[in-house]
Amino acid sequence: MAERRTRSGGAAQRSGPRTSLTKPSKSSKRKSGSDLPNSFSEIWPRTTPAVPVRKAIVLKKIVAHAVEVPDVHTVRRSPRISFILEKENNPPLKVPTKEDLFKTCSVPGTPSSTPVLYTQNVEPDSGEAELDSRDLEMSQKVRRSYSRLQSLGCASTSTPGRRSFFGFEGPDDLPGVSPVVCSKLIETPKVPAKDLVPARTKDLVPDSTKDLVPARTLPGISPPVVKEKRKKKVPEILKSELDKWAVAMNAEFEAAEQFELLIE
């Protein structure tokens, strides 16, 4: 027992220093703030900074074009007349200058010494004389058209209760023209009834209205005479013939029912 204990003690003594020699040290050195830049240089190697390149940028400012206005403002006769009196399909070869524009806009037929603005007042008396003669002529034409009304005193029809008889001397002439007036006032020449009324309707019209019936047989205007359609005569079938026909049909039906149809 003592030997075992000594052996175990010796083994323990021997194993003690062995464990202390083989045990690795887990402690690591912490890097301070002064050592950080050295560590970054180890990770990322230093590179020389590239030289900055300058690029030229062009900035353009949009400015409105200066409008060239001619020095002398000429009075244009009409806004439709253009400065360049040329056709669109035949453009001019040279660019027109201010002098060319001034020449084309000048009014033809007027001297260069006289101004353009005073051309409207040339010979005012002749224009007034023409207008007066034309007014006189037109007034005479108008008076002719209304002279008939003025003589009768019926030119004004603005009053609602006043009747106007345009083209007639008075109300006595109206019954002979107006169809609305009673038929007793109408004096028509008596025409024989044969000429006015057709042969078929002659007996139907009473004697009092025979004179008032207008002629309906006008060539090219009156409607065509409609003829009465005649009824077709249906042939009568005797009862004895119907009975014979029924007996024959019944016999045929009975023969068809008694027929024996054999199917193998």
Swiss-Prot record:
InterPro entries: Sororin. Residues 242-264 are annotated as: C-terminal Sororin domain. Residues 1-45 are annotated as: Disordered. The modification Phosphothreonine is found at T97, T110, T114, T159. GO terms for molecular function: protein-containing complex binding. GO terms for cellular component: chromatin; cytoplasm; nucleoplasm; nucleus. Phosphorylated. Phosphorylation, as cells enter mitosis, disrupts the interaction with PDS5A and relieves the inhibition of WAPL by CDCA5. It holds the Pfam family Sororin_middle. Its main location: nucleus. Keywords: Cell cycle, Cell division, Chromosome, Cytoplasm, Mitosis, Nucleus, Phosphoprotein, Ubl conjugation. A motif (FGF motif) lies at residues 166-168. It comes from the Eukaryota. The keyword Ubl conjugation applies. It is found in: Nucleus; Chromosome; Cytoplasm. The modification Phosphoserine is found at S20, S32, S34, S78, S82, S106, S222. Interacts with the APC/C complex. Interacts with the chromatin-bound cohesin complex; the interaction is indirect, occurs after DNA replication and requires acetylation of the cohesin component SMC3. Interacts (via the FGF motif) with PDS5A and PDS5B; the interaction is direct and prevents the interaction of PDS5A with WAPL. Belongs to the sororin family. The KEN box is required for the association with the APC/C complex. Regulator of sister chromatid cohesion in mitosis stabilizing cohesin complex association with chromatin. May antagonize the action of WAPL which stimulates cohesin dissociation from chromatin. Cohesion ensures that chromosome partitioning is accurate in both meiotic and mitotic cells and plays an important role in DNA repair. Required for efficient DNA double-stranded break repair. This is Sororin. It comes from Mus musculus (Mouse).
